[in-house]
Amino acid sequence: TPKNSWISVPVIDQIKLSLEKKEQTLIFLNRRGYAPIAFCTACRISLNCKNCSTKLVYHKTKNCYLCHICGYKVSEKTKCVKCKSDENFIPIGPGVERIRDEISRLFPDALSQIFSSDSFSKGEKHLEDMDKIKSGEINIIIGTQLVAKGYNFPHLKLVAVIDADMGLNAGDHRVMEKSYQVIKQVIGRAGRYASDGRALIQTWMPRHPVLQALLKDHGEIFLNTELEQRIEANVPPHGKFISLILSGRKESTLIDFGKELKNQFYSLKLQDFEIFGPAVAPISRIKNKTRVRLLIKSNKITKISQIEVRDWLKNITVPNNIYFSVDIDPYNFY
């Protein structure tokens, strides 16, 4: 990519070509806001949510920093908790707003629009925005995952996926499948109404199995390989998971209760089950409550509904100061 740019030269060249042909372009980046991190250059710390163990996302159009978990927000003039200055924060990384700023700088005569849950209004304004996109009046769409959800754009001929590596290394057994599905859906938007659609994927990991499968259109081979690896690891859809989330004020109380649950589970003496944890969850705090999780894994698909497990879960006595939730085959592991 050029200096101070988040969009590579090949992508810029293809957008230029599309504009010359009066074709529509979609730039896909599954990251809301302007930048995912605000960093104080004086103190070398990031701006974090006061309620959750997450970083605040800079939303330039709303003049604020926002937590995407609990909704907490502060003004863009907020001061660093350490140096008490509001002048040292710099945005790190791109979001759709930042990409739009770059597009406006590169192609000042092109009409562009962000397509995300933050920017897309409801009611009549939503219909007007959709009409502008469908008619081709909007030259360049900059969209998050929302754009992959069944929308059809007749004039769209070019799709460019920015930062395709995002999420490929997340600690989730479904991450490769999820990434493949989303990118496949997005690039499938190009040329849906014609045969000359084009798709570009901007990546630092071109040899990654997901991206190679997309490049070579080897979807069936990729999914079969993925299934074989899941079977070998005894994870869904071959095995099953139950996630137990404990939340409360004190981590030590949650860990102690988690150990108690683990001992209770061991006392059931079940075959083909494993239990992991208790451990602090990847997002360790949400809405000022600490989170601890246990994970139960079954080697066989039928075992998770075993009556002993159901009865044990139903009869757990939870202390008043702990919130307890059960998620069978969790889709997210935060």
What are these regions (language model features)?
Residues 1-255, 263, 267, 271, ...:
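Inter-lobe coupling/hinge segments of SF2-like helicase ATPases
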Residues 113, 269-281, 320-329:
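Short beta-strand elements
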Residues 213-215, 308-314:
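Short, aromatic/basic amphipathic alpha-helical patches
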Residues 251-257, 300-311:
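Short, conserved charged micro-motifs
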Residues 262-271, 311-322:
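A common structural junction motif
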Residues 277-303:
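Short, intrinsically disordered low-complexity segments
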Residues 331-334:
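Glycine-rich loop/hinge motif
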